[in-house]
Amino acid sequence: NRVSFSLVICSYRRKGWLEENLKKITMDPALQKLARENGFVVRIVDNAGELADSYGPGIRVYPNENTGGSGGFSRGMEESAKEKDRYGTSHVILMDDDVKLQTESLHRLYALLSYIKPEYRQEPVAGRMFRLDYREMQYTAAEIWNGGDLRHIGFNRDMTQEENLSDMNENEGAEYGGWWFACYPMDFVEKNRPMPFFLHCDDVEYGLRHGGTPIILNGIQVWHETCEYRQSPVIAYYDTRNTLFVNEFLNDIFDYDDVLDKWKQKITEAHLKREWLKEYCLIMAL
């Protein structure tokens, strides 16, 4: 199969992280050959207006208003689709700006898609998330939505232990991959854009809308900060609001009284902890 990537990165005030990954890409001879001969392009959507105009051949920077992750990735998809014929783009990779990347992941993804069987060509590929604080620990290989009560495939596994390797590519039950690193066929991207959630759950809804089972392969991964380090009142707002939207879009059957009870529990917990801003954000989310 002929494979050509558009690597889309939505960036907001992560210049140092981003430039470290770009340096790895530009210094990788195999990736530079793909850029020259196979249409490999890196597209950075700059939501903060802080990046240089150019980082070298094959790297595009698109200044953008701060439209959040949803808007930034959507812009990157649009730019990829506009030039798909020029570059022969077959797949779009969506990657966060605050990950640690090894270019080996891109090599393996290219090899996988080059030899994949026809019946799997339209399936997405989920990149694993390894922990930044314990780098040998896989946090997740792919996700199960479960109505918002997330289940992680291969959750918190120490991948230095042999017993954790035997089923590491098992994707049974997987529904989507997070946009720390995920790859979709251009055929799907060209016709589909993320919901305008600003932050959070855009990757959930997009993957569930695709409906395929994401492929998991060892070595296709990034290191990323896990959710316990990323909590804030604003995040609580988007998580609460967007979860309700996703379930409604999917026509998932759920008990509205149960939803209300869980919401009240969150508000009560925030109130008892004197987290007034979080309490306010949770109220606004509903």
Place the predicted regions along the sequence by residue:
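Short, well-formed alpha-helical segments that are part of the catalytic scaffolds
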Residues: 14-33
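Conserved donor NDP-sugar-binding/catalytic core segment of glycosyltransferases
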Residues: 104-152
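A recurrent flexible, glycine/aromatic-enriched loop bordering the glycosyltransferase active site
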Residues: 156-181
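Donor nucleotide-sugar recognition loop
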Residues: 173-181, 190-208, 213-222, 232-235
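Catalytic core of nucleotide-sugar-dependent glycosyltransferases
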Residues: 233-257, 277-286
